[in-house]
Amino acid sequence: MGIKISTGEPGGHNYLKPELIKDIVSKLNGTIVENCTAYGGKRQRLEDHLKCVEDHGFTKIAKVDILDSEGEFSIPTKTGSIHLREDIVGSHLENYDSILMLSHFKGHMMGGFGGALKNMSIGVASTKGKLNIHSAGAENQEQEYVWSHLPAQDDFLESMAEACSAVMDYYDNKGGIVYINVINNLSVDCDCDSNPEEPCMKDIGIVASLDPVAIDRASLDLIYKSNDPGREHFLERVETRHGAHTIEHAVTLGLGTTFYEMVSIDK
């Protein structure tokens, strides 16, 4: 089983720590999987990314596979997609019959928030796939061009949902995907940031589902329902980026539902 996490950009410190996830990784006998980035930093070059993985302690708890280390392949997006005809993913993805999408739920500079949908779209995409999503499928996907010619915000958010549709359809024919969101270290910034803002809210908990739409909606709802004094600051990041639109477009594509029942397993 592949366990998809964010390995965290060096300099950042809010990513899911090995000591937190090691038990579930061991229980599943899983391999931690990740892809290289598309914005420079210390995880775009394979050699740098492998050093990051080791420095952050992930190699001490499991095998780690950088999915696009030996190439990539394309999978079609769902009928009804507006921007993307395909999602470009790391070639090693085909080695995994099932995936645990183990996501750190937090804010995000571009997407408003990051959870299961972000991890499954940007996270599963190769470097080229990330540029495909961030450009909303634009013809010119050269890295420098993409970052200086970003699309309309909703086009980007919709492209994330469309990339998710490709990954979900791919795994419908395999062993499927399980989603876990860990709602802790609630910074407004993503784990891809080398200098993230400190968490502005207390940890909330862990949510699990077979539905990526429901889990992200439920995670976001837990923020809205919180009495934490940092709630407004976090939600400002979400709302100014129209973050919930990713969820809305995912519903339109038939990826899941925003109607859910929350079952507590607290002892």
Model feature map: region roles:
Residues 1-267:
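Extended, low-polarity segments enriched in aliphatic/aromatic residues
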